[in-house]
Amino acid sequence: SGSCTLRTCWKKMPHFREVGDRLLERFNGAFKVMAGNDGKSVVPVGHNIKPPDKRDLIYSADSPDFCMANRKTGAPGTKGRLCNSTAMDMGGCDLLCCGRGHREETMVLEENCLCRF
């Protein structure tokens, strides 16, 4: 008589939040690089920076400044936009106003609610 053994292996994706956290960590530690003289390698821009390894996130061009209006790209900038003074996310004044400060305004809106009694 013989015996049979079956073994199945698979890789499982981590939770979506974990993937996002890892990407953010790599984004925050990304290296700016320029092409090496051999045309195949990259060289980090800056002094005393270790060369990136294959798991590091690298970039070669700086992101545009979305805070300021740019006619060339059509970016409107953030000056004059409404923001939420209590929010800590993308719509919050601290981030959206790009450190320029902001003015708080309280508005009272009266609207006909079409209520029937």
Curated annotation (Swiss-Prot):
InterPro entries per the UniProt record, alphabetical: Wnt, Wnt_C
UniProt keyword annotation of Secreted present: yes
Annotated compartments: Secreted, Extracellular space, Extracellular matrix
Top-level taxonomic group: Eukaryota
Keywords attached to this entry: Developmental protein, Disulfide bond, Extracellular matrix, Glycoprotein, Lipoprotein, Secreted, Wnt signaling pathway
GO molecular function annotation: cytokine activity; frizzled binding
Tagged with keyword Cell wall biogenesis/degradation: no
GO cellular component term of the entry, any: extracellular space
Location, primary (coarse class): secreted
SMART domains the UniProt entry points to: WNT1
Lipidation (O-palmitoleoyl serine): S1
Glycosylation sites: N84
An example Gene Ontology biological process: cell fate commitment
Maturation and modification: Palmitoleoylation is required for efficient binding to frizzled receptors. Depalmitoleoylation leads to Wnt signaling pathway inhibition.
Disulfide bonds, paired cysteine numbers: C83-C98
Family named by the database record: Belongs to the Wnt family.
Function according to Swiss-Prot or TrEMBL: Ligand for members of the frizzled family of seven transmembrane receptors. Probable developmental protein. May be a signaling molecule which affects the development of discrete regions of tissues. Is likely to signal over only few cell diameters.
Pfam family membership, one: wnt
Name of this chain's protein: Protein Wnt-6
